[in-house]
């Protein structure tokens, strides 16, 4: 006879108001920006093997921090900093209800103040940063803060990362492709080195639309990669499936 309890343990129950992953749930109904492919890409891709202390700048719902917690060893500690109060509270709640409650800590604070006052440095910093210029006012103030660069320009983001990163640390971001190239140029001007660049498109023949970057203060060759999220017929590519298989249900 099938044990229903064992079935429930193996397959997470779907819940509303958020996104159910294999090992955790991310509530995002109080966050301006919801769980999306950008955050999932960064959380699944970022190198965690050498990380011991991690910072997620603009952590939103806490998605990326929780993905890194799942992928990393138990001694790795992860901090998230988030300006918007509702999002920070929800990220704290998501972390508290996850299997890694003791390892993930959320700070509701402006990252500029955080960078000035925080005593710790991080060997891995990640960010899914804002990317719209505030030329047109957004109808939702929280969403405006989450996705417009008015509160965190790329120049300011790099400056904050410089203050918070260890000498050998890496800084990883995901952005729309054109803005990622702009950030790359700005980073080089500020004496960062591009150590890895992943150009992303939806499927073969489509234009590049996202970019993953690894920046470092240490010189080294740049590794260039390309990722198609889907195959020509529209199904997820084997490469993308390999990234998400530990997280997405049914993969």
From Swiss-Prot:
The keyword tRNA processing applies. GO terms for biological process: methylation; tRNA processing. GO terms for cellular component: cytoplasm. Its EC number is 2.1.1.223. CDD domains: AdoMet_MTases. Gene3D superfamilies: Vaccinia Virus protein VP39. Keywords: Cytoplasm, Methyltransferase, S-adenosyl-L-methionine, Transferase, tRNA processing. This is tRNA1(Val) (adenine(37)-N6)-methyltransferase. It comes from Yersinia enterocolitica serotype O:8 / biotype 1B (strain NCTC 13174 / 8081).
